[in-house]
A protein has these predicted regions:
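Short, structured segments at the rim of ligand-binding sites
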Residues: 1-435
Length: 435
């Protein structure tokens, strides 16, 4: 298990280039399973979760050529379906929640799909019912082996239908879309997630020959086609990393420019940080954050405490609530953080309290942060990263704290952030990796 050793309290300065979006990559990397032709994808983040998925696809029989860092050519001409029932497949796929995304394409093209209960962040209950309910409506039959924790699904022929999801699941939406594009007839898909990741997937599939309309809305119409071809696709910049860097700049009183952010795909993210009092400026497609000595949290117009909560797109992404919480610890004023979509994402606050933050954990979904207004600095401590987003939030806290911090289990951070320690050192951070 590796660790980061950080000496905090340093002001940083410079430019950061954003990696490709992890959440998009885990979806679009599975789309080549829908065709025997070559698919080229660029701006793929070089992170643990994505590399695990690439390795899994290769082991399944997908031919993969690395053109350069971040750009690969995929060709799923000869898939070994028998491998999908082996112990090796079960072990590999179980270590990665993104492995669930192979089921829709396999079901659409080969009439069957298999997946063990997938892994991922321990951030609360993350049910898979949405995926399999959608597949069943398309005509598939589902089986779950409780002893093996192994899902299997098959269909002689998928048929277009009306689907109304009970939740706007991002991965569920992506999986069902990939199944429906090769179904017979038309699928009307209501309460679909419409995050930029989903929009990107739909655009990619259309460039492969799919017929998807309603992109960017929660009502999609998918006309099934007989086959798909190859394409070129470029992954968007990672909005979660962009938000993380905004929080980093504010907490460390640093002047940072974030390059090529695809501003039009950031939604409410910039304005949510502005509500904490953070100054940021759009410069072309870059974000400039000046060094700020202090920042003050807004209140509602009646003077009551501001509440920031997550919601399906176009609401505020749950992946950035932990960053918002950390940033609020050094603000003037107070804020209620309401994590509606997951019940275990706020449990890392005990580590921030140990660092000197004033936080009241109301229940598994809500925390009130009383900002210190820089009257008292956080202090360095030893801690363990519980998941990707909490891990990078603790990293930001450590970079702003006085003294030495050590963060263990940084493999969690590596799952979502490419070369994070190298990029931070380039800005002037005192951080080193200990193996």
């Amino acid at each position: 298990m590796s660790s980061f050793e950080i000496y905090g309290g340093k002001k940083l300065k410079g430019e950061l280039t954003v990696q490709g979006a992890k959440n998009e990559a885990l979806q679009v990397l599975c789309a080549p399973l829908l065709t025997a032709e070559k698919v080229t994808i660029s701006n793929i983040p070089d992170i643990v979760d994505v590399n695990k998925l690439i390795d899994l696809l290769q082991t399944m029989g997908v031919k993969i050529e690395k053109v350069e860092r971040g750009t690969y050519v995929f060709q799923a001409k000869d898939i070994d379906l028998t491998y999908l029932e082996t112990e090796d497949f079960k072990k590999r796929a179980a270590s990665l929640r993104g492995s669930i995304m192979i089921v829709g394409p396999l079901l659409a093209r080969f009439g069957k799909g298999f997946i063990p209960k997938p892994g991922g962040d321990k951030i609360g209950r993350r049910r898979l019912d949405t995926h399999f309910d959608g597949f069943a409506l398309l005509g598939a039959k589902f089986n779950y082996d409780a002893g093996e924790h192994f899902y299997s699904i098959e269909a002689k022929k998928l048929k277009g239908t009306y689907i109304h999801l009970d939740e706007a699941s991002v991965t569920g939406t992506a999986n069902i879309i990939m199944a429906a594009v090769l179904a017979e007839g038309t699928t009307t898909f209501y309460n679909a997630a419409c995050e930029p990741y989903i929009q990107q997937l739909c655009k990619m599939l259309n460039s492969m020959g799919a017929k998807i309309s309603g992109i960017s809305s929660n009502l999609l119409t998918i006309e099934g086609v007989k086959e798909l071809g190859g394409c070129y696709h470029r992954i968007l910049p990672d909005m979660i990393e962009i938000g993380s860097f905004i929080g980093l700049a504010a907490m460390t009183q640093s002047e940072i420019t974030i390059k090529d952010v695809s501003w039009e795909n950031l939604g409410v993210i910039p304005n949510t940080f502005r509500r904490l009092g953070i100054k940021l400026e759009r410069r072309g497609d870059d974000i400039y954050i000046p060094a700020q000595e202090s920042y003050e949290i807004d209140t509602f117009i009646d003077g009551s405490i501001l509440t920031i909560y997550d919601a399906p797109w176009p609401g505020f992404t749950p992946d950035l609530l932990s960053i918002i919480l950390v940033v609020a610890t050094q603000a003037k004023g107070s804020v209620l953080i309401h994590q509606k979509m997951f019940e275990s994402r706020l449990f890392f606050t005990d580590k921030l309290i140990d660092m000197g933050a004033q936080i009241i954990l109301c229940d598994p979904h809500r925390a009130t942060v009383i900002g210190l207004g820089r009257q008292h600095h956080l202090r360095g401590i030893q801690m363990t990263s519980p998941d990707i987003r909490a891990g990078v939030s603790l990293l930001i806290a450590a970079l702003s704290a006085e003294g030495k911090s050590v963060i263990h289990n940084i493999e969690q951070i590596d799952r979502g952030y490419q070369d994070i320690d190298i990029r931070l050192r380039n800005l002037g951070a005192d951080i080193r990796r200990i193996n």
